[in-house]
A protein has these predicted regions:
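Short low-complexity, flexible loop/linker segments enriched in glycine and/or proline
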Residues: 90-92, 170-172, 292-296
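Short, flexible loop segments at the rims of nucleotide/cofactor-binding pockets, characterized by
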Residues: 101-105, 131-136, 303-308, 330-333
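Short secondary-structure boundary/hinge segments and terminal tails
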Residues: 84-85, 112-115, 164-165, 287-288, ...
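Short acidic loop-to-helix transition motifs that present clustered carboxylates
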Residues: 108-111, 161-165, 188-189, 359-362
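Small-residue (G/A/S/T)-rich helix-start motifs and N-terminal tracts that mark the onset
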Residues: 1-79, 179, 190-357, 361-386, ...
């Protein structure tokens, strides 16, 4: 796993590295060298480097110097003369580079900048670093849209200029990079809000050869789950296994209005590996669900006049749930009074539980001042997983603003830390999904935009249930297990986008692609670890 840092954590880590003997000036040289080497992989004949006033610009000056030494024609666009750059380190390398075989253009007009961009094979963005926030000012408010309109290939150093490295928010405009070469560790803003849209492919340069020894000296905002981290979850089934030892799941879901949610969750749990899946649904929709799921038993639960779980549902559901290895509650169940009673009853059972969708909305209605103010309501010995998207998560913490990855992680941690249980994990769903446990936050593979479709969350909930039921012995690493499930959902999303087109994917497309997604994920895990098939030519 690869740490993801906040801007404050990056500053602390650089200070530690400096105390260990590598100065900020040396880090700038290493950053510029790494960026230059990544640009050289694109085989450019001519490169345009845009620099700003600070140390990110210094990285750009160093990169320009190295590219020139490698035989690349280099133009540098600067807002001021090298001697006028306010940052001391950047001013030093700018003076040095300006005396070499490069062309420096100070404060060009828009037309002059367009000409320079048109000549370049690659544009290097070294305008702003991780300290940028707020609004763009001239000349950068002119440079950035001009680059976006005219450049064919942009490589940003550390973060795309205009992006808030902490929140991922773009207030005005931002460089749209094909590649972002980030230094020491990825920044949290690259995965949050607008970050993924503007950053392009991410490449991380460690810069410091003892980074692994010191990076744990600072807290991590999160960690990226890499394909090889999941390799243990792709082991083949034992030949002597039976359906019950593969794990049993009860799906408590559905209503007359939303029967499909229960159907999709149940099918997904089965496709994810559970050996025995059953559904407990209101009797108003039970027959419809039975017809759609011929291989899955369906329990008809007393319903109310609107076809949701009724007043007698709690006792019936809880009695059934005791017999299962895992319970998923919530998809399509509404927030009726009976549904709220079912949720509170399941929380009291000694069984692994996943709360999704309306089950979370029921919780929010029960605890109107935020569930983090009522941790006894959800503190339990058995595993508990909550899967809110941003709006649901905001309701759970009584309206705290949740609109990007950083605020989602903060809200999820409020819920987890209030309970103080190693068995509680909140999966904050978004463009980048965060798996938040009491001690760590993991960022698994993000899926395509096509996953933003109704019912996609029901499929993910089913995958989580099937995964938890099948692998309950993973008690020491719940977050990684759930990262595996989220990654499968993402892989299925990519497969569906390829099969049907990004804009045409519907949630049911994902279900039959869960199996193929496992195969692709397993292959990626082996490749990430450098393990090849015996028949490979490599």
């Amino acid at each position: 796993m690869k740490p993801v840092l906040s801007t404050e954590e990056v500053v602390r880590l650089e200070d530690i590295i400096e105390r260990e003997g590598t100065s900020k000036a040396e880090l700038m040289e290493l950053a510029g060298e790494f960026a230059a080497n990544e640009v050289l992989k694109l085989n450019p004949d001519r490169v345009l480097v845009l620099v700003g006033f600070g140390n990110n610009g210094g990285d750009g000056w160093v990169a320009a110097d190295i590219l020139s030494h490698k035989g690349v024609d280099v133009d540098i666009v600067s807002p001021v003369e090298p001697d006028e750059i306010p940052a001391a380190l950047a001013r030093h390398v700018a003076r040095r580079t300006a005396g070499r075989d490069v062309h420096v253009c100070v404060g060009p007009s828009r037309d002059e900048l367009e000409v320079l961009i048109d000549k370049a094979d690659v544009v290097v963005d070294a305008i702003f670093g991780t300290g940028f926030h707020g609004n763009l000012r001239a000349p950068f408010s002119i440079w950035i849209p001009t680059v976006n309109e005219c450049a064919d290939c942009v490589v940003s150093i550390d973060v795309p200029s205009g992006l808030n490295a902490e929140t991922g928010v773009v207030d005005d405009d931002c460089i749209r990079a094909e590649h972002t070469v980030t230094m020491i560790a990825p920044k949290i803003g690259l995965y949050s809000a607008d970050g993924p849209e503007y950053a392009g492919d991410l490449i991380c340069g460690n810069l410091y050869d003892r980074l692994d020894e010191v990076i744990d000296d600072v807290d991590h905002a999160a960690e990226i789950v890499e394909p090889g981290d999941l390799v243990d979850y792709f082991a083949p089934l034992p030949t002597n296994i039976d359906k019950y030892s593969r794990g049993s799941v009860l799906i408590v879901a559905g209503s007359a209005q939303y029967p499909g949610a229960a159907i999709m969750a149940a099918k997904s749990a089965a496709r994810a590996g559970a050996g025995y899946v059953a559904v407990a649904a209101p009797d108003a929709c039970a027959n419809l669900i039975r017809m759609a799921l011929p291989s899955i038993p369906v329990f008809a639960i007393p319903s109310d006049s609107r076809g949701s779980f009724g007043a007698a549902a709690r006792m019936t559901v809880c009695e059934i749930a005791k017999k299962y290895g895992c319970v998923l509650c919530g998809p399509g169940m509404t927030t009726s009074a009976g549904a709220m009673q079912v949720v509170s009853g399941l929380l009291e059972l000694d069984v692994p539980l996943i709360l999704d969708a309306d089950a979370l909305n029921c919780l929010a209605k029960i605890a109107i001042d935020g569930i983090d103010s009522n941790p006894e309501m959800y503190r339990r010995e058995q595993p508990l997983v909550m899967t809110p998207h941003y709006r649901e998560l905001s309701r759970l913490v009584a309206g705290d603003e949740v609109n990007d990855l950083g605020t989602a992680i903060a809200a999820a941690q409020k819920v987890v830390w209030a309970a103080g249980s190693d068995n509680l994990v909140v999966i904050a769903k978004g463009p980048t999904t965060a798996i938040c446990g009491v001690e760590r936050v993991l960022l698994p593979l993000s899926g395509p935009a096509s996953l933003a479709t109704a019912g996609s969350g029901d499929v993910l909930a089913g995958i989580l249930a099937g995964t938890l039921a099948t692998m309950r012995d993973e008690m020491d690493r719940w977050e990684l297990l759930y990262s595996y499930a989220v990654a499968l959902h993402s892989y299925a999303g990519f497969a569906a986008a390829t099969e049907y087109g990004e804009k045409s994917v519907i949630a049911t497309d994902l279900i039959d692609l869960i199996g193929p997604a496992m195969e692709v994920a397993a292959k990626d895990a082996l490749e990430d670890l450098g393990i090849m098939d015996e028949g490979s030519d490599d």
